[in-house]
Curated annotation (Swiss-Prot):
Signal peptide annotation: none
Protein name: Nucleoside diphosphate kinase
GO CC annotation, single: cytoplasm
HAMAP family: NDP_kinase
Reaction(s) catalysed by this chain's protein: a 2'-deoxyribonucleoside 5'-diphosphate + ATP = a 2'-deoxyribonucleoside 5'-triphosphate + ADP; a ribonucleoside 5'-diphosphate + ATP = a ribonucleoside 5'-triphosphate + ADP
Disulphide bond pairs: none
UniProt xrefs under InterPro entries: NDK-like_dom, NDK-like_dom_sf, Nucleoside_diP_kinase
Entry's EC annotation: 2.7.4.6
Function: Major role in the synthesis of nucleoside triphosphates other than ATP. The ATP gamma phosphate is transferred to the NDP beta phosphate via a ping-pong mechanism, using a phosphorylated active-site intermediate.
Length: 147
């Protein structure tokens, strides 16, 4: 099974979209194996977005993601990175397809509700910023039976 790091950004939390986003993830068949709400400090935010350091939007991005609470998650499932990237849609909400998280909820390219790691090679690094190994739950199966 592949893992993916997902973070609901401050605009998603402040607008009450956490439950909707989690529901979409679970309905798609991805399993949440770690989750926490926290307020990022500058150091964590800079580590998460280190690939953008030096770009014109970097300081605004860091200010934005440290402006309020976020919900960090690790999800697991077959092709989790690809599945999650398709679910969230284009970085620019105006270009994101309807039905994707960003297509439905993004306010702008900067305030686009959710972050998800863009490649399997980066997942372990991003997960380690937020979670220790012992915080990731192992060994449970999803049961979609209706009672």
């Amino acid at each position: 099974m592949e893992r993916e790091f997902v973070m609901i950004k401050p605009d998603g939390v402040k607008r009450g979209l956490v439950g909707e986003i989690i529901s979409r993830i679970e309905r798609k068949g991805l399993k949440i194996v770690a989750m926490k709400m926290l307020k990022l400090d500058r150091e964590m935010a800079e580590r998460l977005y280190e690939e953008h350091k030096g770009k014109p939007f970097f300081d605004d991005l860091i200010s934005y993601v440290t402006s309020g609470p976020v919900v960090a998650m690790v999800v697991e499932g077959p092709n989790a990175v690809e599945v999650m990237r398709r679910m969230i849609g284009d970085t620019d909400g105006a270009k994101a397809a309807p039905g994707t998280i960003r297509g439905d909820f993004a306010l702008s390219k900067a305030r686009n509700v959710v972050h998800a790691t863009d490649s399997p090679e980066k997942v372990a690094r991003e997960m380690s910023i937020f979670f220790r190994d012992d915080e990731i739950v192992e060994g449970y199966e999803l049961c979609h039976s209706i009672y």
